[in-house]
Amino acid sequence: MADINIENFYRHIAVALSILYANFPTKFALYVDEVAGIDEPDEYGLHSPRYTSGFFALLWLEEEGYIRYADTIHQDGVDQACLTHKAFLKLSAISEPIYAEPSVVDDAKVVRLTPTQNLSPSVIEERKLVINQMRMALRSGSSLAVNKVVRHILYDTL
């Protein structure tokens, strides 16, 4: 099991990239609330560690060349955010399934993956887009799926 901070980091990365891709090429303010969830500061004005890590995940994405932005909005987000060329190409690339939930064949075997033979080639290709695999991983709620897709994006070179 991965450390919870790493799992949160991967989820923050996935959500941020998904939001930015959906708005590409528009530049807009991306708030930590959208990435890490709504959080109210405590009586000292400090946010939760999860919220803070969401903010620093956005900064990390910029430092590593996946996004660009004009400025930070306190510790609440980044202004004029947009995907970089590198991130856009990685997210719009076609990839064999990065992670697929196995389906149950019978009680003894859990080996068969979701079939694709009855789908049209265009639907299969659309499902193979990295961004769509990431969206499916986020919808599934599976930390393992999100982690695998984000690692594929971060570690795979063009």
What do these predicted regions represent?
Residues 20-24, 61, 90-94, 157:
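Generic structural signal for hydrophobic core residues of well-folded globular domains
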Residues 106-158:
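Short, cationic, amphipathic peptide segments
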Residues 79-122:
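Short, amphipathic alpha-helical interaction segments positioned at domain boundaries
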Residues 59-75:
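A short, conserved structural fragment
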Residues 4, 46-49, 71-79:
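Short acidic, glycine/proline-enriched loop segments that cap or flank alpha-helices
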